[in-house]
């Protein structure tokens, strides 16, 4: 049977590692008494469009907690330069078909709506020429636009397909007229978008990605998706169908989630 006739399977992978510079041991920190990684895995389990899901980790303590809770775990190398490299190892270990789709669910975003996971997967299915898909949302305030921790994205529309042109920590696009005036409007451009860290990949892209060295812009911006663009790949992008709640990067973020009632947290 040709690959064109074979069914496309969708796999959700949750990369989880302990080495966080801002919040050590992040996947194992608890929200309402349960390790964060388990909240994320339970959310992924609600995504009924996927054929399967697993947690990818290089840490035995994370693996044990997830295995004890009944989740599939894949042990991966601790030497990966990026999360995408880790996904590629999982795809190789699992023997997934080149035309299959992998959805990357961040291990520090326990409130991700399954709707967005399905949206990013569908986006990739609908754009046969793209090797990745991701989402974005409008930036409404100037401080967010200027913040380096917020990744911005500019895109183009070609043949009714919207694709990313560039991702940056810098404030892009730049409003030339505002920059050249003495009075800054303190308003982001109307077409300023924040990139959301949800990705869908074709396994064929993951197979190629690991053989490509880190690229100059990827290293400069510390954004792994730039490796795809610098090697000529297309990344489909769309405005998120709903808002993506903030993930957990700091102790304040963790405290905010623990301050929510358990019912509100579970029903989010």
Curated annotation (Swiss-Prot):
BP-aspect Gene Ontology terms: CMP-keto-3-deoxy-D-manno-octulosonic acid biosynthetic process; lipopolysaccharide biosynthetic process
One Gene Ontology CC term in the entry: cytosol
CDD domains: CMP-KDO-Synthetase (cd02517)
Transmembrane segments: none
InterPro entries found in the cross-reference section: Cytidylyl_trans (IPR003329), KdsB (IPR004528), Nucleotide-diphossugar_trans (IPR029044)
Known pathway: Nucleotide-sugar biosynthesis; CMP-3-deoxy-D-manno-octulosonate biosynthesis; CMP-3-deoxy-D-manno-octulosonate from 3-deoxy-D-manno-octulosonate and CTP: step 1/1; Bacterial outer membrane biogenesis; lipopolysaccharide biosynthesis
UniProt keyword Transmembrane helix, yes or no: no
GO molecular function: 3-deoxy-manno-octulosonate cytidylyltransferase activity
Pfam families: CTP_transf_3 (PF02348)
Recorded superkingdom: Bacteria
Catalytic reaction equation(s): 3-deoxy-alpha-D-manno-oct-2-ulosonate + CTP = CMP-3-deoxy-beta-D-manno-octulosonate + diphosphate
Keywords: Cytoplasm, Lipopolysaccharide biosynthesis, Nucleotidyltransferase, Transferase
EC number of the protein: 2.7.7.38
Transcription regulation keyword on record: no
Subcellular location: Cytoplasm
NCBIfam families cross-referenced by the UniProt entry: kdsB, PRK05450.1-5, PRK13368.1
Functional description taken from the UniProt entry: Activates KDO (a required 8-carbon sugar) for incorporation into bacterial lipopolysaccharide in Gram-negative bacteria.
Stated family: Belongs to the KdsB family.
HAMAP family membership: KdsB
Protein name in the entry: 3-deoxy-manno-octulosonate cytidylyltransferase
Organism: Psychrobacter cryohalolentis (strain ATCC BAA-1226 / DSM 17306 / VKM B-2378 / K5)
Gene that this polypeptide is encoded by: kdsB
């Amino acid at each position: 049977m040709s690959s064109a006739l074979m069914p496309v399977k969708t796999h959700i992978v949750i990369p989880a590692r302990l080495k966080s510079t801002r919040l050590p041991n992040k996947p194992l920190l608890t929200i309402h008494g349960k390790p964060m990684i388990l909240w994320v895995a339970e959310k992924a389990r609600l995504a009924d469009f996927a054929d399967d899901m697993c947690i990818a980790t290089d840490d035995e303590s994370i693996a044990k907690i997830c295995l004890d809770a009944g989740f599939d775990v894949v042990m991966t190398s601790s030497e990966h330069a990026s999360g995408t490299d880790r996904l590629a190892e999982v795809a190789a270990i699992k023997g997934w078909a080149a035309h299959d789709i992998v959805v990357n669910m961040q291990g520090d975003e326990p409130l991700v709506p399954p709707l967005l996971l399905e949206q990013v997967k569908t986006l990739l299915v609908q754009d046969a020429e793209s090797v990745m898909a991701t989402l974005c949302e409008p930036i409404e305030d100037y401080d967010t636009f200027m913040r380096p921790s917020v990744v911005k994205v500019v895109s183009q529309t070609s043949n009714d397909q919207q694709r990313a042109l560039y991702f940056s920590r810098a404030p892009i696009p730049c409003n030339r007229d505002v920059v050249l005036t003495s009075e800054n409007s303190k308003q982001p451009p109307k077409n300023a978008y924040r990139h959301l860290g949800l990705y869908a990949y074709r396994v064929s892209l993951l197979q190629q990605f690991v053989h490509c060295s880190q690229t100059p812009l990827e290293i400069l911006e510390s954004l792994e998706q730039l490796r795809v663009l610098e090697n000529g790949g297309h990344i489909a992008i769309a405005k998120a169908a709903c808002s993506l709640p903030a993930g957990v990067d700091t102790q304040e973020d963790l405290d905010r989630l623990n301050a929510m009632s358990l019912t509100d947290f579970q029903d989010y």
